[in-house]
Amino acid sequence: MQIFVKTLTGKTITLEVESSDTIDNVKAKIQDKEGIPPDQQRLIFAGKQLEDGRTLADYNIQKESTLHLVLRLRGGMQIFVKTLTGKTITLEVESSDTIDNVKAKIQDKEGIPPDQQRLIFAGKQLEDGRTLADYNIQKESTLHLVLRLRGGMQIFVKTLTGKTITLEVESSDTIDNVKAKIQDKEGIPPDQQRLIFAGKQLEDGRTLADYNIQKESTLHLVLRLRGGMQIFVKTLTGKTITLEVESSDTIDNVKAKIQDKEGIPPDQQRLIFAGKQLEDGRTLADYNIQKESTLHLVLRLRGGMQIFVKTLTGKTITLEVESSDTIDNVKAKIQDKEGIPPDQQRLIFAGKQLEDGRTLADYNIQKESTLHLVLRLRGGMQIFVKTLTGKTITLEVESSDTIDNVKAKIQDKEGIPPDQQRLIFAGKQLEDGRTLADYNIQKESTLHLVLRLRGGF
């Protein structure tokens, strides 16, 4: 019959074999084809390393089965296995050894059957089919050996539909194991399961004992929407934290995860995404935060300050703010007080229009500073700016924006200083002090950007 052998490089070799061939014979055939000495070959099938003296039939390898070929590292390495009694065993292994192989070596040394062994490394229970390399276990690493309790216990898992599932478990079972048992019973993939006990979400690498889950305890099963995702949180110090979240997580949940990782109390955290401060009760989905999005974490200053906002009618509003408030936040506070929608507000300080995503601190707005509030005419519009390289930039503007303002927006997006920009529309170069309305530039008009030569005139 034919079988296939797949190497780590992705190459697949076809071999003519018989069920009665031994693993030695197969390695000899591989040597004939590929020139790899048998003692450097390890063959894996169904997660198990195949032993030389056994036959293909012993492993139920049938026609068109695929074996995986792993090359042995020249020379192995030593690792240590520490038992709960404090005894340390030394094993000769290779990175490509599977966890099954390691358990077999422990059985050879200590007489403990593999099915009573649990191996833990870096807080994770190791799965039989995986290799030491998969877990980044290197020379002189120490694994911990925990014996399975003979005789488990029953626990209950209650779903949102009200159905209760009974599981046979042991205190030393990890949450991963429990999820696998739920999958066996209910067909729900582990990555769609969330298990809750005593109000806490249970983490995969931990054991039932870690959470003090005892016989006849009840866990609650919540289904994850569409599996989880990773997002990043960048702090002002430049550090980036990675979080495992779901679209349905609330901003409160995210702050709690940041507290778990970094120790920062939620009430001192402000999260910013796309220039907006995120509100506690909302979900990531509400803000269209998707996998691998980056949030910005700003710490609240303890104790805020007062600023003033003066309107064109001469009325002055007093606001309680913090330096880390974004301009969006300030506009929201003005809306609360005056009922003016944020998209109709323009805030001016020191002659500059303030941009939504920036903070008061960015503009050096301090206590008792006065901002000026101008109402926008009929909301804004989009225009396009085309560069000589053919790139098109989209800008949010208003008819009353000056050409200076437009150049500043281009600088924010592209980093080109205004004094190196020339804007052309309808064959005319646009002058800084004029407005878009002066040139009859309307929504979805296209301007052309030409760079000034340095030292030009």
From Swiss-Prot:
Residue span(s) of domain Ubiquitin-like: 1-76, 77-152, 153-228, 229-304, 305-380, 381-456
The alphabetized UniProt keywords are: Cytoplasm, Isopeptide bond, Nucleus, Repeat, Ubl conjugation pathway
Show the propeptide residue ranges.
457
Determine the domain of life of the protein's source.
Answer: Eukaryota
This protein's major location comes to: cytoplasm
Q: Name one GO molecular function term.
A: mRNA binding
Q: Name one GO biological process term.
A: response to salicylic acid
Q: Known Pfam families for this protein? A: ubiquitin
One GO cellular component assignment for this chain's record is:
nucleus
Location in chain, cross-link Glycyl lysine isopeptide (Gly-Lys) (interchain with K-? in acceptor proteins): G76
Locations listed in the record: Cytoplasm; Nucleus
- Known function: Ubiquitin exists either covalently attached to another protein, or free (unanchored). When covalently bound, it is conjugated to target proteins via an isopeptide bond either as a monomer (monoubiquitin), a polymer linked via different Lys residues of the ubiquitin (polyubiquitin chains) or a linear polymer linked via the initiator Met of the ubiquitin (linear polyubiquitin chains).
The family note in this entry says: Belongs to the ubiquitin family.
Further remark, if any?
A: Ubiquitin is encoded by 16 different genes. Ubiquitin is generally synthesized as a polyubiquitin precursor with tandem head to tail repeats. Often, there is one to three additional amino acids after the last repeat, removed in the mature protein. Alternatively, ubiquitin extension protein is synthesized as a single copy of ubiquitin fused to a ribosomal protein (either eL40 or eS31) or to a ubiquitin-related protein (either RUB1 or RUB2). Following translation, extension protein is cleaved from ubiquitin.
Protein name stated in the entry: Polyubiquitin 10
Recorded name of the encoding gene: UBQ10
